C-alpha cells in the first residue's frame, strides 16, 4: 500500500501552467502532486566560448531549490558560496536530456538557459524539472520562429522523465517524498516521445536489484513518460 | 503622467496569499502589481553562536532573486559562488525591519529565518519582501503559540515598507520598474503600524533633493504604509 | 551628557591631511576625533566593461578596516576570503555619494577608484570616508587638469557626510563609538556643498523615530556638513 | 572494428597492484589498459557530525585527476578553488557503490575515506576507481581485523564497475578513450559479486537507445564485472 | 652608484613610532625610508585548536598591503576573495621569525597576532614588518607583565630582518624599490640580537650567485641587523 | 646516528624514471628514497596575459600532494577550495628555480607548466620536485626541437635542489621525514650544474644557526647537487 493510496502504476496529478511569469521567453510551472518547479527558458544571442564560431547553439540548465521548499530549511547555496554536488549532478542531467531532442545546428549561434527552481518539494524534482523545462524550451523556440529568427522549431521530439522504484518490495511509479526516503531502489528514466531511452539512472539504496526488477521498472517508467508527453502536448495546445 | 496611468499617490494592486507553500511555518506570496515575492518563515529551536545562553531569540532574513525574475536573465548567485552587495544590503535591511517589531526576549532561544525569494520583479522587491515577510513571521509565531511553545505572539506591531520617489519632477508612491529606472530620487521607508519610522533610505539618483521634497515623500510613504498595514490585517483575518 | 563632554551640536575635531602617502594621485588622511581613515584616489585610463565606448568615466570606492582598528581584533577579510555585507554596503554608499557630484562625461573614459582604509575606528567611519575621499578625488582630478588631460576639474560641488542620532533621548551630532553603540536612532546624511541631500539613511536601533525627530536630526546634519565642507575647503587651500 | 582491435566483449588488460604506496591502510594501483588510478583507503577513528553517536561507521570517497593525466592539460581543481560537477558526481558514485557492500554497523564508529587519483586517463576512470577502491577498502578492513579492532571484515561482498556502450552501432565492453569520445550510448554498471545491480547509469550521447540495446549492454557488463571480481580475488590472494 | 646616493652599507633612515594607534596591545609604525608598515599586536586569551590543552601559547602574523601602497594600484585581496601566494609566504615568514625568539610555554595559553599592514611601499616591506612587529610583540607582552598575567616578558631576544642584494654588480644593504626591481640577487636575512641566523632566503633574479658573494651579503646583513636592533632598543627606551 | 643509518653526507637512493605517463610532453617519476614525485611538463602554444606580445615564453609550476601521500591523511585542497600557503610557496619556488636556467626568449611565445604531484612523501618533496621537473622540462623542450619548433634546446644548464640540516647537532645531507621533523635547522639549496646558487632558504626550527654552520651546510648541499646533476644526466642518456 502506498502512503498516498495511489495504485502502483499511478502518477500523481500533473499540472503544467504556461506563462507563469512574464519576462522569460518560456515560463512554465509544473506540478507533480505537491512538487512544484518553476522552469524558465532564457534566450541569449551568443554561445559559450567553447562553441564560438562553430555554427551551432547550446542548451544548458541550472537547478535550484528554495531554502524552505523542503520539510526542514536547507541552507541557501548562494549564501554558502557553492552549489552542492547534488545540485550540479541534477543540472547536468537536465541539460543533457534537453540537448538530446534539439537540433543544435538548427538553433543557430544562440544559447537557451533553462532555470529550474523548486518552489515546493515532495520527491521527483529532477524529473519534474526535465518534463517542465521541455515545455519552456519548446515555447522559447516557438517565439524565435514567430519572431522570424528561425524557420522552424528545432526541437525534434518530446523528452520527459519519471522516477520509479521498489517500495516495500513492490515496483511503483512516480515516487513521492515518503516513498523516496524509504525505498530500496530508486530509478530515474528519461525518454523521448518516440519511446527511446535518453538516460537511465538506477541506484540500489538498500538491496541490489535484479535484471527482472529493472525490466519491470523500465516498463512502469515507459507508461509514465507516455502520460507526461500527453500532458506536455495538452499544455502546448492550450 | 505615470507609465502605469496610476495617480501619484496610488499603490499598485496588493495581494497577499497565505499558505502559498506547505512546509514552512509561515508562507506568503505577496504581489505588488507585477512584483511577486515568496516569503517563508522557518523556525529553528536554537540561536546563532553570538546569542547562545543570552535568553533571547533572533530573527534574520535572506533574499534572492530567481535568475529570470527580471527582464534579462541575471546570473545565479549560487553558481557564481557569492551574493552581490545589493543582495546582502537588502537582506540586512529586511532583518533589521522585522527585529524592530518583535520582542526577542519573549521569542525565547529560537531563531526565525525569513526567506524572501523574488519570483517576478517589477520594482520595489525589497519593500514587498518586508511587507510580506512580516505576515509570514506573524503566522510562524502564531503557530508557536498554538503549539503551546509561547504564551503570546511576540510580534508587537506591524511593519511594512514602501518606495517613493521623484519621477519626472513629481513625487510618486510605489515606483514600478519603469519609474524606478528613470527617477531622480528613490526612497524606501519602513514604518510600524503605529506610524513610527524604523528605517528611511533615500538616494538621489540624479539631482540632490531638498528638505521639502523629502517631507512630501515621507507623507506619501506614510499613506502607502497605512494601506499596506490594512492589507496585512486582511490577510491575517482571512 | 555626551561621554565626550561635547555639546549636542558639536563635531569632533576634524583634521584633513593631504599627501599622506606618496604614490596615489590623491592621498588624504581624515581624522574625526579618534577615527582615522586613509583615503587614496587612483586614476586608471580605462573604464569597467559595462561602460566601454560610452564616452564617460566612472568613480568607484572600496572600503576596508584594518583588523585591529577596533577595540577587539576583527578577522581580516582577505584571510576569510570575502567581504562582509557591511563592507559592501559602505563601499557602495561611498561610490554613489562621490558620483553624485562629478560630471562623468567630463571625466572622459577613465576610472577613479577611492580606497578608504580605516586605520583607527571610533564611530562614523563611513561618513569620514566620504568626506575624506572627496578631497582625494578632487586632488586627483586636479592633477589630470595640471597634466593637460582635462580642461577643467569635473567635480562640480563638494559632498560630505555626517552621522546624527538620538542618544539618551537627545539628538546629537557626529556620534562616536560609545554613543553609536548605545543610541536609539542612527542616521547618516550625505549632502552637497549647496545643501542638497544626496543620501539619507536612518535606522531605529531601539524605538522607532518620529517625523519631528527626523527633522531635528536633518537640521543637525546640515550644520555638521557645512563645517565639513569648510574643512575640505581649508584642506584644498593649504 | 574497435580501435584497439579488441573483441566486443573483451576487457582491457586488468592489473591490480597492492601496497603501491606505504602510508595508507589500503593502497592499490589499478590499471585497465592505459587507465591508471591510485586508490588509497584511510581509516579515521571518528565519523562525520551527522553520524555521531549513532553506533555506525561511514565510507566516503574523493576523486581527482592529475592535471596532465589527460591528452591536453586540464586545470588543477585546487588552483581553481573548486571541484567540477563531474568530479563531484564521480566521487558520490564511488561512495555509494562501496557503501552498498559494507556493513556500516559492523564497521563501528570510524570512517574510511577512499581517495581515487587518476595518474593516467584512457577512459573508464570512474569504473576503475570503484573496482580498485574496493580492494583498498577490503585491505584496510582486514588490517582493522588483524589489529583486533574488528572481529570480522565488515565487507560483505565484492563490488566492481565497468562501462559498456554502443560504438559504431555495436555493443562493446570496457570503452577506452577513443571509443568513449565517439560512442552513441555510454553506460556504467556497478554490480556485486553475487550479480546484483547496485547502480546503472546509461546516457545516450547521440541517438536514444532501446530496451533491447539496454539488455545486451547489461549482459556485457555482467560478463565484465565477473572478470573484474576474479581479478579482485586474485589480487587479495597474492 | 645607488639611485638613492646611499653608501653600499648604508641603511635608509629608520623610524619606529610606538602607540601609533590606540586599541592594540602593541602598535608600531615602522619606517625604512619611504616604506611604512603599521604593526599591531593583539592578545587573545585562547590558542588555535591544534594547541589546546598543550600548556603553551602561539604567535602568528598576517600581512596586507593597502591597494595604493604601491606605484600602481593593485587589487584588494579582500575583494578578490583570496590572498596571493606572496602574501601567504610573507606572513608565514613573519610568524616563524617572531616565534624563534619567544618562549611559547612562558607565554601561557594565549595567542598574539601581529598584523603588518603596509601603508606605503618602497621595497623591503617583509623585513620592515619583522623588525616592527617585534617591537609590537614586546610591548604587548610587557602589558601582560604589567597586568600581572605574566611574571616576566617571554620574549628572549631581539629579532630583526634586512634585505641585501647584488645591484649593478655590487653588494648593497637595504634595497629600496628601484634597486629591488633591478637587482641580480636579493636576499632577506633574519637575525637575533645575539647574532644568530634565524632565516635566510636568497634568490638569484638574474645570474646565479657564488659562495663568496653570499658571504659578503651576509656580512652586510649582519651589520644592518645590528643597527636595527639598536633602533628597536631606542624605541622601547623612549 | 641518522635513523636511516646513512652517513652524514649520504644521499638517499635516487631514481629518475622517464616516460612514467604517456600524454605529457615530459613525464618523470623521481624517487629520493621513499619520496616519490610525478613531474610532468605540458607545453601550451600561448603565454599568460602579462607576457602577450613580448616575444618570450614562460615556465611555471604547480605542486600538489595526494591526500594520503603522508602518514595521516591530509584534506584534499580541491575539496577545501584553496591551496595552502605551503603549497603556494613551493610552487613559486619550483617555477623560479626552473626559469633561472632556461632562455625564455629562445623558448618563444609558449608556456611550459610543470605539475609536481607527490605520490608518496618522506621529506624533501620540494627539492625532489625541482630536480625531477628539470628533467621533464628538458625533455619537453627536446620534443619541441625534434618537432622543428625550436632550433635548439633553450635550457642552458642543469638545476637541482637538495635539503641539508642540523640534526642532533650534526650537519646532514638530504633529510628524510624523521630527520626533518626533529631537526634544528633546515635548509634548501637550489644550484645549477655550473655550481652557482639559485636559491637558498634556511630556517632555524630550534636554535639560530651560525655563519660557520651555514658554511658547512652549503658545502654538503654542493656535494649533493653534484650527485643529482649526474643522476639527471644518466636519466637523459638512458
Swiss-Prot record, chains A, B, C, D, E, F:
CDD domains found in the cross-reference section = RNase_PH_bact
Which PROSITE patterns has this protein been placed in? RIBONUCLEASE_PH
A Pfam family it matches: RNase_PH_C
GO terms in the biological process aspect are: rRNA catabolic process; rRNA processing; tRNA processing
Residues that, per the record, bind phosphate: 86, 124-126
So what family is this one in?
Belongs to the RNase PH family.
Protein name, entry field: Ribonuclease PH
| Species annotation | Dechloromonas aromatica (strain RCB)
As recorded in Swiss-Prot or TrEMBL, the protein's gene is named rph
Amino acid at each position: 500500500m502506498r502512503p498516498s493510496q495511489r495504485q502502483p502504476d499511478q502518477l500523481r496529478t500533473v499540472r503544467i501552467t504556461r506563462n507563469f511569469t512574464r519576462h522569460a521567453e518560456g515560463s512554465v510551472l509544473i506540478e507533480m502532486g505537491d512538487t512544484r518547479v518553476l522552469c524558465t527558458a532564457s534566450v541569449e544571442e551568443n554561445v559559450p566560448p567553447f562553441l564560438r564560431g562553430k555554427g551551432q547553439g547550446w542548451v544548458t540548465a541550472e537547478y535550484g531549490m528554495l531554502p524552505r521548499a523542503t520539510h526542514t530549511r536547507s541552507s541557501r547555496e548562494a549564501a554558502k558560496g557553492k552549489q552542492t554536488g547534488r545540485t550540479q549532478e541534477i543540472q547536468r542531467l537536465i541539460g543533457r536530456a534537453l540537448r538530446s531532442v534539439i537540433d543544435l545546428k538548427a538553433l543557430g549561434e544562440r544559447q537557451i538557459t533553462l532555470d529550474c527552481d523548486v518552489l515546493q518539494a515532495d520527491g521527483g524534482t529532477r524529473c519534474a524539472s526535465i518534463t517542465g523545462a521541455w515545455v519552456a524550451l519548446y515555447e522559447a523556440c516557438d517565439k524565435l520562429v514567430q519572431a522570424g529568427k528561425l524557420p522552424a522549431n528545432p526541437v525534434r521530439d518530446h523528452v520527459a522523465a519519471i522516477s520509479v522504484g521498489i517500495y516495500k518490495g513492490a515496483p511503483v511509479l512516480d515516487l513521492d517524498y515518503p516513498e523516496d526516503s524509504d525505498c530500496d531502489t530508486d530509478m530515474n528514466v528519461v525518454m523521448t516521445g518516440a519511446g527511446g531511452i535518453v538516460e537511465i539512472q538506477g541506484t540500489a539504496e538498500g538491496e541490489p536489484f535484479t535484471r527482472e526488477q529493472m525490466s519491470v521498472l523500465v516498463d512502469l517508467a515507459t507508461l509514465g513518460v507516455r502520460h507526461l508527453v500527453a500532458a506536455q502536448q495538452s499544455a502546448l495546445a492550450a
